[in-house]
Regions:
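Nucleic-acid endonuclease domains
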Residues: 1-94, 112-221
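Active-site beta-strand-loop-beta-strand hairpin of nuclease catalytic cores
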Residues: 90, 99-111
Length: 221
């Protein structure tokens, strides 16, 4: 992704987030996915053209899915602005997204997400030790290539103001750029990663606070 492409895409996502629902409303499924080739769509305007004839439910589904997919690309772009972070050079290789410090032991699949409902009443404890939440993610979210688990870096978005603010939080690019830069500076192979099912993971918490400030928290580094 070039700087120009990032600028266009980040602007598109900030526009799109205003009209997409917080929740899916439908489970990801092949019958809906086959209606359009979402992975060939590069811009918000093109997406709207492709889904124009679909039902409102399908429109919401594709808007949300495309938003999350493209948001992940923007996250990876921001990480790769740091000299010690490189993107997987093989776009077809799904075993990892990013590598830190030219170290194959620091390869991670990057996963944007939120704090699950069952953990929201104990956020302070989760931030202090997210092990249980990480285990929940691995047990309940999609697994990696050929049903094998991958090292994962979870980007956990949470708004203390309103849960509906968690989607716009994903588009706070200036905030994220600073957070990812700090993380890239701190990560080492000696970090206290969470181990589960023979893989390792870490969490970057991205918070919007009640006073409108934004803060972050790292677990392993």
């Amino acid at each position: 992704m070039t700087p120009t492409e990032f600028q266009q895409l980040s602007t598109d996502l900030q526009s799109l987030v205003k009209i997409i629902p917080l929740n899916w409303g439908a489970v990801q499924n092949d019958s809906t996915d086959c209606q359009i080739n979402m992975f060939k769509i590069d811009t918000f305007s093109e997406l709207e053209q492709q889904i124009a004839s679909l039902t409102e439910a399908s429109k919401s589904y594709f808007r949300r899915r495309w938003f999350l997919w493209k948001n992940a690309q923007c996250d990876e772009y921001l990480f790769c602005l740091n000299k010690n972070v490189i993107q997987n050079p093989n776009a077809k290789d799904q075993s990892y997204d990013l590598e830190f410090n030219a170290n194959s032991q620091l390869r991670f699949d990057v996963k944007g997400t939120i704090i699950p409902r069952g953990f929201r009443n104990k956020i302070e404890a989760v931030v202090k030790d997210p092990t249980e939440m990480i285990q929940f993610f691995y047990d309940n979210q999609s697994v990696g290539v050929r049903n094998k688990n991958q090292n994962r870096l979870f980007l956990v978005h949470h708004s203390f103001k309103n849960q509906e603010r968690e989607m716009p939080l994903r588009c706070n690019w200036d905030f994220k750029k600073e957070v990812y830069e700090k993380y890239a500076e701190k990560i080492t192979s000696n970090a206290n990663f969470i181990s589960y099912k023979e893989v390792k993971s870490d969490v970057i918490f991205l918070f919007e606070n009640e006073d409108n400030s934004f803060t972050s928290n790292f677990f392993a580094v």
